[in-house]
Amino acid sequence: MELNPREKDKLLLFTAALLAERRKARGVKLNYPEAIALISAEVMEGARDGKTVAELMEAGRQVLRVEDVMDGIADMIHEVQVEATFPDGTKLVTVHNPIV
């Protein structure tokens, strides 16, 4: 299987998000990369499902709570930017204050 660098990045992100999802389900608090991956994957999958940028900006804020991440992680993540593929092209989605 031949993948270009962008496809490899998406696959790596998705794999990290799956790991984060499993850890969260077990009650393990997520670290910085896991939190970013889980929020990013939610945005990317939502774009693929046809949601709008505005819907995804809000959906990205619903993924994690402060209780889901290690101490200090919520304070470190002020925004998450994801380049997502929509039916009408690629757009940059910014989720502000994603962990509430």
Swiss-Prot record:
Pathway(s) per entry: Nitrogen metabolism; urea degradation; CO(2) and NH(3) from urea (urease route): step 1/1
Classification via InterPro entries: Urease_gamma (IPR012010), Urease_gamma/gamma-beta_su (IPR002026), Urease_gamma_sf (IPR036463), Urease_subunit (IPR050069)
Catalyses which reaction(s): urea + 2 H2O + H(+) = hydrogencarbonate + 2 NH4(+)
Gene Ontology terms describing biological process: urea catabolic process
Locations listed in the record: Cytoplasm
Residue pairs linked by disulfide bridges in the UniProt entry: none
Family: Belongs to the urease gamma subunit family.
Protein's name in the database: Urease subunit gamma
Organism annotation: Saccharophagus degradans (strain 2-40 / ATCC 43961 / DSM 17024)
Recorded name of the encoding gene: ureA
